[in-house]
Every structure is written in C-alpha cells, then in structure tokens.
Amino acid sequence: MSKNVILKADNLYKSYTTGKESFEALRGVSLSLEQGEMLAVMGSSGSGKSTLLHILGAMDAADKGEIRLNGELREDYGTEPAATKIRAEQIGFIFQDFNLIQDLTVEENVALPLMLAGENNRVIWDKTDQMLEKVGILEKKKNAITELSGGQRQRVSIARALITEPKLLLADEPTGNLDYNTSIEIMQLFLELQQEQDHSIIIVTHDAMVAGYTDRILFLHDGQVCDEYRCRKNGDDMDHIVDKFKTLSLKKGR
C-alpha cells in the first residue's frame, strides 16, 4: 500500500525581474513527496533548485501553480500571514550556512522557535535537550556557536529544525560547507530521521554521494524537471548519478 502524499506541487512557475531583464527560474515544475520519503533535487547553478525549495518551504510564493500540504490545497502557500504559520508548525528548514545566531549558545539557538511561539519554559528546555540528544550533540548545549566545528553546527541547525516536530524537512545544500567524512555523518543522521521518525525530507544538492542516500532524485535544468531517478541506496549507482549530473552541467555550458 502506498503511503500518504505529504507534499504535492503542480505546474509551478516563478519569474524574477531585475531592471528590464526578466528571468524564469521555474517553468512548470511538478513533484510529489510521500510520508517517510527522502527526495534529492539536483541541478547545475541557475537550474532553479534553490528557488523551488524556497517555494516549497513557504519562504517565497510561486507566480502560478498549486501546492497541497497533507492533502490540503493551500492557495495562501508562500503568502503572509499563512506562510509564517506553515513554516512555524509544519516545515523544518536547514540551511547550507547553518543560519545560527552567534551570540546565543547551542541550546538557545535550538530553543528559539519555541521561545518565539510562546511555549512555557519547562517544555522549551525539555524538548531542546531531547532534540540535541537526537542529533548527538547534547554535551555541547552550553557552548557558544563559535566553539563548534562545521559538522556540529549543522547538527545544531537540524535540531532547531526538528524542535517544532514537523514531519517535513527541507535542506538546502546541507553538506555544502562540510568535508567528505562529516558529510557522510550528516547524511546518516538524515537517514535515521527518515527511517526511525518517518520524516519526509527534500534535499537540494550538487553532491552525488548525498543524493545517493535518498530514495529518488529529480534533476532540474533551466527551471524544468528533465529527469528522475530512483536510487538503489547501496552505493552501486554512484557513477550513474555522477554521469547524469555531468550531462546537466554540459547542457548548462552550451
């Protein structure tokens, strides 16, 4: 039996205008994500992958198209005040540059979404400890962000994304600033969240190793889905994923 579709996007378009120039970032992109599925979005620079993730994360609004979240058509998706509520309650977003507040401790960064929501202190700090333990960094909770390695900072970012208990996680190049071994550790953490907590995850990446951890890969080129690949998740298809990405890069250079 197939699982419930947690997120479905149909025929998304997005354009940006700079001066007299207009640029189509997305041209009719459609996708669906099942509960407990992990999906990678790959594409060369300028393919529209980050724009797509920001729209799916209710951080921007599409010009045209439909988005259904948990089966509900949301015509207000990406527009305020609905977008803030969607982000706060249903989506966890993880950034490449971690997006942490340097003046706060580890635990304060993780607790911030609950503080802003007006949760009571006991719930805030109990859940903060739970999330930090889940990502394997509880012993660093009193540390300053500046005292952490890149991998540790990304774990803090993931814990913060989890604190409101969203079922949907969106990650924009989550290993982009990490070395190879640390990237593997972070992807294994995502895999644990998927398999043990039934999280649905979309990861934008240019890294074939990262994409190989997911269930499916959508390849974007020039604002459109140009290919889709279902991963074996055993490492045997890494060369195939790399070849597909190289093909997109060659198209970009023409």
Residue ranges and their predicted role:
Residues 65-75:
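Conserved ABC transporter NBD signature motif
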